[in-house]
């Protein structure tokens, strides 16, 4: 059964805190079943709110999905910016390490993959393009604008996304091909 993300009894959340709680609950549900496989009833139950309240705050299930996706993409941007700021002389390696650490957050990882998968919807596609473009522009700014380097960094990240979603690190001990996917990436396959 899904855990509730409501505030402790006796405390009142601000509107921003309530929105954040609902987005977190939505991310947990959407990351498991995607946009079309998730019910607003399940999200409301997890958040400890009424289902109509979701629509009052977000307007539609799609808007809530986009808010949850945006939060996941923002985690990536924040991790890249923080890593590059902490190690400006070796920003690429620091950002790569930060991304590998993010992969342990399966919820965010799966939210991004569900955003890509739901992009047959024009509204989702446009929002996901915008989020992905923001990541690419940030990587260009942090690493320099060499297109080949940026493409390589993004491609490595996408390979890691798919590999982590398929739990290839857990398979690496049994399958040599899975282990080869992580050579030199810093991913712990042990």
Language model regions located:
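Hydrophobic alpha-helical connector segments
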Residues: 67, 78-108
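Solvent-exposed, amphipathic alpha-helical segments
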Residues: 25, 29-32, 78-83, 111, ...
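Hydrophobic/aromatic-rich alpha-helical bundle segments in the mid-to-C-terminal region
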Residues: 122-133, 137-190
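Short, intrinsically disordered or compositionally biased N-terminal tails of bacterial proteins
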Residues: 1-7
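Alpha-helical DNA-contacting segments of helix-turn-helix folds
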Residues: 65-72
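Short alpha-helical scaffolding segments that buttress acidic/His motifs in well-ordered protein cores
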Residues: 99, 112-116, 153-157
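Amphipathic alpha-helical segments used for helix-helix packing
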Residues: 103-122, 132
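Helix-turn-helix
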Residues: 18-21, 25, 29-63
